[in-house]
Every structure is written in structure tokens, then in C-alpha cells.
Amino acid sequence: MQMGVTVTSVLENNTDKAFAIHIFCDGVSKENLDKTRQLAEKYQQNFYVYIMDMKPFQMFHIKTRHFSRVTYLRSVMPKILKPLTDKYLYMDADMLCVGDISEITDIDLQGYPFAAASETPQAVAYKTSFLHQKSGKHFNDGLMWIDIAEWEREQITEKVFSYQGADPSRFSGQSQDIMNLVLDGDILFIDRRYNGGSDKGTLIYHFCGSNKPWHMVLNDADALWRHYLDLSPWDSMPDPLPPKTPQHYFNYKLLMERSWQKKKLGNCLQYLFWYTVLKIELKLGMQ
């Protein structure tokens, strides 16, 4: 579903372009395959689905519970796509494109293996210190504009695989940490509006935080994701409130702020009530 929304957003905002869309996964249900076919037919674009054998990736670490080793597939994509193209744009499945994608694909890579956006300054400071990166730079690998020949020349896939079996305590994340250790800042850095949050002017939204728009709508970017879901072949979703548990008190603060901006006073007061109650419960140690 998430992939379908990402692709729908790209195609809706780039109707003048022809695409070859390559989808890499470790498995796919019949329902999702049927929906993908519907997506291809609706937009008259070419789709290719790769169901990957994950055995070669089993020695890579899994750092967080909601991740899987599928994140490491991006490290072998250049070898698979090499007979088909010189360059390609890699995107995570938790993204939205809200404008002209050629803003990215027209970028001159200047001899670098790929272009990517930096993490936030706070994340860069933490990550570069944790990973002992000499460059002081750290990119997000959720979107990469890749030159396959340069990637191959620098043997990036092979260098990534050299980290198989490494002590997981060396890393705070997964493929992104390894990619940054391999490149250590030697890429073309592009504006964060091409891999960003909800700032004005963002071209590519990236929902890489703990709150996901397919779980709940907490801001305008989440609502935009639901809009593209409605345009896709996948079923629309209800918009439930966050659970009324102390751990979710801050989500009610976000809802309160959004309601205030939209001048929905009744909703604002409702969310203020639950924000206050749940925050008190959290301080009292109630579950």
C-alpha cells in the first residue's frame, strides 16, 4: 500500500513523463500485485516487480523492530538495473512527491556516485559522532539519484557487503549507517526539500519518523498522504484518533495545534482535554 501511494503521487504530478518503475521487495500478496497492475493500467506506465531472495542478506544486522533486511536491497539495485539504464532515482516507499520529479533527475551528478539530502543538523551531529565519520556529513539514503557507472567504479555494493557480520552495536541504524561509513560524505548533497518533512517548499515528503500517516493523521502532510491514498487503487482508510494512553499524549498536542490553525475550536478543546489528562497520567506513572 505505501509503495502504491508513493508511486501514485509521482505519477499524478508528472503526467507528461514516461516512467519505468522498478519495485524491489521480499514478497508480495496477490491483492497487492493486482492493485499494482491496476496502477500500471491507470497511468499507462511500465512496472517491474522483483521478489528478491533474501538469503544473501542474512548476515546484515537488524537494528530496530519495525525494520527488516529489505532496507539492504538498495545496495544491489545498481547491479540489477545496470543493463537497463545509466541512472535511476531510488525512493523509499514512505515518501510523497508533490511536484516535478525532474527537479531531481536533471541534477548534474558531477562525477559523484549519487546525490542525496543531508539529515537534520541534530541527526548529523549525533550520527557522525556515533559512527566516527571524519567528514562530519551524514545523508539520508531514502532518496538517491544514482549514476550506476560511478557506483560500480567505487565498488559501493562490495564495500557495503563487507560490513556483513559486523557487531550491531557499532550502528544506530541499518543500511543508511553502512552507506555513510562507506562514502563518508563523498557524495553530491542536495537540498533537504528533496527528502524532507512538512516544511513549505518540500518536493518530496519523507515519513521516516515514528508517526506514520497510514496510522493516524496528525498534520497537513499526513492528510496529503491520505489524499494520494484515495487516488490510488488501494482502499481508503478511516482516520481514528490516537490511542488514549499516556504514551500518546504528545500526538494530541499536535492535533490541538493543527485544529487551532484551522480554526476548529471544538476539536481544539477536545484535544487539549486529552493532552492534559494523558500528560498528567504519564507523570503519575499510570498506564
Annotated model-derived regions:
Residues 1-14:
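Histidine-anchored nucleotide/phosphate-binding helix
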Residues 8, 34-37, 83, 98-109, ...:
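Short alpha-helix within the catalytic core of nucleotide-sugar-dependent glycosyltransferases
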Residues 19-27, 116-118:
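Short internal beta-strands
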Residues 31-80:
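Active-site-proximal specificity loops/subdomain of glycosyltransferases
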Residues 88:
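Short aromatic/hydrophobic "clamp" motif used to bind/position activated sugar donors
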Residues 91:
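Catalytic metal- and UDP-sugar-binding loop of GT-A-like glycosyltransferases, i.e.
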Residues 95-129:
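Conserved donor-nucleotide/metal-binding helix-loop-beta segment in metal-dependent transferases, i.e.
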Residues 146-287:
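A glycosyltransferase accessory/donor-loop signature
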